[in-house]
Amino acid sequence: MRKALYSLLFYMCICLYIYTPVFMANLKEIEVGNYFICNLRDYPTGNCSVDHDYNKTIKLLCPIVNNKNNSNKTYDPSYCFKYDGIKDEFIINNKQAYIHNTLPGVILTNNIENDTYNLSIYPPFVVKEDVTIVCICDSEKGNEGITPYLKINIKKTHGLNNDLEGDYIKGCDYGNNQGKYKFLTKPVKYTSNPICEIDAYPGDVVGINCNSYTTKMQGARLEPEGCFAMVYFSILTMKFIKTNVNNIMPNAKYYPDLASHPGNQNSKIFLTSYLLIPNEVDRDILIYCNCSYNGNKGLAIYRIFSTKAS
């Protein structure tokens, strides 16, 4: 009897393993671990709504419509914009309002998988007022009058726990974004300030940005690729090695997570990254990333101390 019961349980586990992924792939809204997935690939006339949570990654699956120009393999950033409501059963199209006007420091990353845009949306860690944004998909043939979309409700935020000392995230912005576009503490020009230094402590969020929201910057790149997942590291000396940040701070979190998807085309548009330093750091360390512009570099150095200064 017991052997028969074990055999039945084993059979049930195999069935769940085989069939659950297929079943989940046909759900419109999926929550798995720390992911919320809006699946508009299989629901091309649908929509989703979610409240943003920094502990969850929000993903949108959009079908690639063949009659569109997708040669550069990027998800068009103008497809994400501030939500202005529904009129006559259609979403109000506000694509002219660039997403950075609403959320300076937002990141969109995209991977192409099975003729599908696999988009991840990372709002910044400072949001000055409650806001709702939408990201839309192209309409498929036969559904031209219907716009599939994901709606994201984002609450006013002042750091992860309202713990910022100022109004901005600690970090180096070699895009020199200022005024309404400012989101990092140090907007700088690499031509006049090739070195930017940040002091950080356990629990801090730090950032880097290489992109200007107002001026086209030729040949901009964030190095090492995948920063802050990968960083140049030193124990407060000037001898650096490239390593995964979790080798030196095991509980550190980085946004976006591009470790498994190098060469992400949308990340080359946004050129922004954040690092959440864990609440416990064993020792003082030094890391850096840089913004590269056709061989010229802006160096962003982060001195991370194990304890806060008294």
From Swiss-Prot:
Q: One Pfam family name from the record?
A: s48_45
The UniProt record lists the keyword Glycoprotein: yes
Which sites carry carbohydrate? Answer: 72, 114, 118, 290
Coiled-coil-forming residues are none
Report the InterPro entries cross-referenced here: 6_CYS_dom, 6_CYS_dom_sf, Parasite_Repro/Invasion_Surf
Record's function text: Involved in sporozoite infection of hepatocytes and replication therein.
Name the UniProt record assigns to this protein: Sporozoite surface protein P36
Specify the species. Answer: Plasmodium yoelii yoelii
Q: Lineage in the entry? A: Eukaryota, Sar, Alveolata, Apicomplexa, Aconoidasida
